[in-house]
Amino acid sequence: MVSYASIRQSSDEADSTVDASQKLDARKQDLNNFIQRHIGPSSADIQHMLDVLGFSSLDDLIEKTVPSTIRLHKKLQLPTAQTEYAALAKLKQIASKNQVFRSYIGMGYYDTITPPVIGRNILENPGWYTAYTPYQPEIAQGRLEALLNFQTMIIDLTGLEIANASLLDEATAAAEAMSMSYGVSKNKANAYFVSHDCHPQTIDVLQTRAKPLGIEIIIGDHQTFDFQKPIFGAVLQYPASDGTIYDYRAFIETAHAQGALVTVAADPLSLTLLTPPGEFGADIAVGSTQRFGIPLGFGGPHAAYFATKEEYKRQVPGRIVGVSKDVNGKTALRLALQTREQHIRREKATSNICTAQVLLAVMASMYAVYHGPEGLKQIAENIHQLTVTLAEGLKRLGYKISSEHFFDTLRVELGTNNLETILAGCQARNINLRIFDETAVGISLDETTTPEDLIDLWQIFAGEDNLPFTPEELISSLNLPLRSSSYLTHPVFNRYHSETELLRYLHRLETKDLSLTTSMIPLGSCTMKLNATSEMIPVTWEEFGRIHPFAPLTQTRGYQILFQQLEAWLAEITGFAGVALQPNAGSQGEYTGLLVIRQYHESRGETHRNVCLIPTSAHGTNPASAVMCGMKVVAVACDAGGNIDIDDLKAKAEKHSHELAALMVTYPSTHGVFEAGIQEICAVIHSHGGQVYMDGANMNAQVGICRPGDIGADVCHLNLHKTFCIPHGGGGPGMGPIGVASHLVRFLPGHPVLGSGKNPQNIGAVAAAPWGSASILVISWMYIAMMGADGLTQATKVAILNANYIAKRLETYYPVLYKGQNGLVAHECILDLRALKKSANIEIDDIAKRLIDYGFHAPTVSWPVTGTIMVEPTESESQAELDRFCDALIAIRQEIAAIEAGKMDTHNNLLKNAPHTIESLIVGEWLHPYSREQAAYPVSWTREYKFWPSVGRIDAAFGDRNFVCSCLPMEAYN
């Protein structure tokens, strides 16, 4: 401990002693300063990079990079930056205001037990949560295998033929099923039947999704629906929302006779006991895997599933993992059938889904791997046994159970008993039930329920009377239409049931993948920045994790404080009047923002406004989202500099002035520059009565420097999994909240269960839960709290510095395709590789795969311009890491030069044969005109640490021609 008395020699030195104390305190503060932990380059690094670029300061760089007309000339009004310790303490205080009740509300959400081996080694493991979507499959075989397990699990449980690798939530999955049914149904109907037994949130999301597409939603009883009104599809809940298990065969047969497709929203745990949807005729099955070990999290994130028949494989939304082979004939996995996705089909895509819920799908799959078929069945039987016992006790207490057949949920008719008395008993015991109405309540049990819990529940209904029975008297046999087919028979679900075995399996998979624990991931438009441990810790807190999304608001005051603060911070950062946190992915943020614009026009009697202008450089989700909102996409050209062609914009806006609804624009542009004409662009749209939707994918170059609302945007979505540090999770989770100008606030999303406090003119629900994937919002809260206004602004400046440093170092080797007015880029740069095809027969994939040999994930390839790579380093990477990456690309350029000079074969060379696996180096005859050393250790640092791909280059076409999306026999992996 420092003693200031030791340096206090006289009263004359008192002032200097105080100064020394202040300096020491400041130094101590600096050592705990999260900003320095988050931003990669040191002060010396920053100055060196500025010197290379010819600037004296970061402010000087920003002045030349960002147009002066849009720069923010004031400090963001945010709380002072806190240390990691202080921020965690503050958030813990907020979390303590949440009350963790035992929730038996059900409605698709259940308390569950996350096996500690899965929680510690997946959810809390950066090797899993910092990876990106597996677009480079050679360095993603681990999570691809885990996702193949997920798909196999869903295929087996549902009895259908194919499944995807997750969707955002059950309600969204049901909406995707409706859209797919609309697209493939052979009849011309535009009506869709929705059983009134579906969960309320699912019905609301379906209504939201249907309206702009002109689909009529018919809500009714499947038992009495007469099919006089032609329908193209239907959705049924299994078991029903009130717990009833129906036999849907007759309904499905009648629907099929009319040419309609039937979707069944099924609880996957119940399918370990119940007849699977595929066996009674369902065309599509959707649902949530939340109860497979995923915390409630006040609504998410959770992995939904989507299964269907193989004939619809090219219409399935989201990612599908497929089996293929590498160049050596070894079984390998990859994302299959990508040509059906939004980044390829754009406005012709049937879905805008991009980010989904990979991390949660991995957890759910491993829950099934760990428990196996017998373990899952035992969990389901225990839950059902307790439910049967609970029902028998309630009957003895004089209550009526509305259903004869049920799995885990009871609808209890109260008769002459008073609801308020029941609820008072619940409150006294910290219990939540579902309230159907004044006459009935619902009780849904889960794997955490114990016999002691049943006693508490019975006592609530017994009131002050003693229970006239004991639990032992009530045990009865299972009462279900049991499935006869087997499931989860693959060895992967029957091998890893000890913690030791599962731990090793998880580690083997993890080490096959390149994540941020390995090296920088320089993907343009993806912002793969640090996901700090201190930001991630609160996700695991029970106060956030064990809250049901429909718990009374009086029990979730901590969450409400979190939401209010985060909304206010994001509104200040974006310059908007209101923020909605419900959209649970960037794609859903786009969709929500456009729906808000659509609703705004409708409120003004301008329903004819349905044209959306979109630059040709836009991300594929933009046109896909616009079409989902019932808009007609009109493309706007870009000029030779990569900017929006303002003359073409003016012409298109003038031509479609009467119908103009919106412009979708990304800023900085998808070409990586701050377009000087952005304010004029916004003004043109407004002059024709349109609204400006700004895609916030590149917000990491704006925070603290400029704001969408000030620039002229009316709506902007934020990718919290980019700019605000939620990890990508290998392909999700994400969050896509939107900010809106004051005239649009009243249209922000609502919710049918908890409501939203918004104007009745709201667009309805866009996600199953009121605040989307609420539990991961703590990550962004922590990031902003620890960075403060100065830290956030500094991060933006350094992100721009890092990108310009890379562009400068590489421009003599690879042309930088687009630059701003002063020869600078924003937070990312596009390197033009197109000439290499002619000079050396080198494709962009060759460079991407060769980077793996150097230990790097490739930048974004062939987007937004074919034959280019887009590099985004973020602010979190040090100069040393930037130099390593640049050195790798420079070395690769020298390898290409050897081909150009005729020193290396144009087909058998280091790039064409990349990546090189250990097996390819040591097994068999070496038939290449370069050494094994050149292949494996091209630069010195690869000798210190080498990331080895587990497979060679994958044959993508083979996988699509021979489509398989479930686990192969184990011998196939040998």
Curated annotation (Swiss-Prot):
UniProt xrefs under Pfam families: GcvP2_C (PF21478), GDC-P (PF02347)
GO biological process, one term: glycine decarboxylation via glycine cleavage system
Gene3D superfamilies registered for this protein in UniProt: Aspartate Aminotransferase, domain 1 (3.90.1150.10), Type I PLP-dependent aspartate aminotransferase-like (Major domain) (3.40.640.10)
GO molecular function, a single term: glycine binding
Disordered: annotated segments: 1-20
UniProt catalytic activity: N(6)-[(R)-lipoyl]-L-lysyl-[glycine-cleavage complex H protein] + glycine + H(+) = N(6)-[(R)-S(8)-aminomethyldihydrolipoyl]-L-lysyl-[glycine-cleavage complex H protein] + CO2
Residues found modified as N6-(pyridoxal phosphate)lysine: 722
Alphabetized PANTHER family for the sequence: GLYCINE DEHYDROGENASE (DECARBOXYLATING), MITOCHONDRIAL, GLYCINE DEHYDROGENASE, DECARBOXYLATING
Official protein name in the record: Glycine dehydrogenase (decarboxylating)
Organism: Trichormus variabilis (strain ATCC 29413 / PCC 7937)
